[in-house]
Amino acid sequence: MSVLVYFSSSSENTLRFIERVGLPAVRIPLNERERIQVDEPYILVVPSYGGGGTAGAVPRQVIRFLNDPHNRALIRGVIAAGNRNFGDAFCRAGDLISQKCGVPYLYRFELMGTQQDVENVRKGVNEFWQRQPQNA
C-alpha cells in the first residue's frame, strides 16, 4: 500500500486525525524552509484555510510541496479537512487541489473528524489502493 501525505498546522487537528487512521503517513513540514520529496504514489490529506475564500485556502507549505514536479506526479487523490462554519468554502482546499492536479476528491471531514470519519477514510483508502494498477 502507498502512503498518506499530510499537512497539519500547529493546532495539529490533521495530525491527530492521521494518527487515529493508523495508516503509513508522511508529514509535510510546518517550517516552510524544510522540504520533503515522496518516492511513491500517495493520497494527500490537507486542511483548508482562509475563512471562506479561494485565496489562501491551500496552506503555503502544501503549495510548495505540490510545486515540486516529482511530488505532483505521484499524487493520486485528496482528502480535505475543514470547518463547516465556512459554509460553501468547507474543505475548499480539497476542491482546488483535485481540480488543479486532476485527481479524485476522495473524502472530506470536519476539524479532527469523528470516529466514523476515521473508519470511512481507513476503509476508503484501502479500497482505493486495491483498485489502482500496480504501477500507478
UniProtKB/Swiss-Prot annotation:
Belongs to the NrdI family. Probably involved in ribonucleotide reductase function. One of its GO terms (biological process) is protein modification process. InterPro entries: Flavoprotein-like_sf, RNR_Ib_NrdI_bac, RNR_NrdI. It comes from Enterobacter sp. (strain 638). The lineage of its organism: Bacteria, Pseudomonadati, Pseudomonadota, Gammaproteobacteria, Enterobacterales. This is Protein NrdI. GO terms for molecular function: FMN binding.
